[in-house]
Amino acid sequence: MSSGIIFGNRILDVAIIACFLAQFYKVFAPMFKGKKANWVRLLQTGGMPSSHASTVVSLVTSIAILKGMRSTEFAIGMVFSSIVLYDATGIRRAAGEHAKALNKLVKSVERKDGLDKIESNFKEFLGHTPLEVFWGCVLGLATGIAFR
């Protein structure tokens, strides 16, 4: 296995590059709709494409190419990437939906009862739709193959 350029580990380098590409796309995606680049998105979760998906899929792709699909590293990567992908579309997405509902509920109670502002601005942009995860996987696969 050849050493990587960034961390001295080719597999880790590819995963970091895939994550960066996904996040970098999110910064400039608003420009396709005539809006300004949103640099805050570089460090936020959620959105298109899933950087979690691109990271773990590029990792597993690199392991498959460099170590083989019968390697222990590939097996470990597959198990953990499955957990990450499930978490992104299932648990984290549901948590984001719960946050939306709670934020609406708190605003409703504040208006109805005339209460002071309740600190409840729960983060709503957490998980991913299946389509966002799909495109993250495509980006991860392409990155893993491109940087083999």
Place the predicted regions along the sequence by residue:
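Membrane-embedded catalytic cores of phosphoryl/pyrophosphoryl-handling enzymes
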Residues: 20-25, 38-148
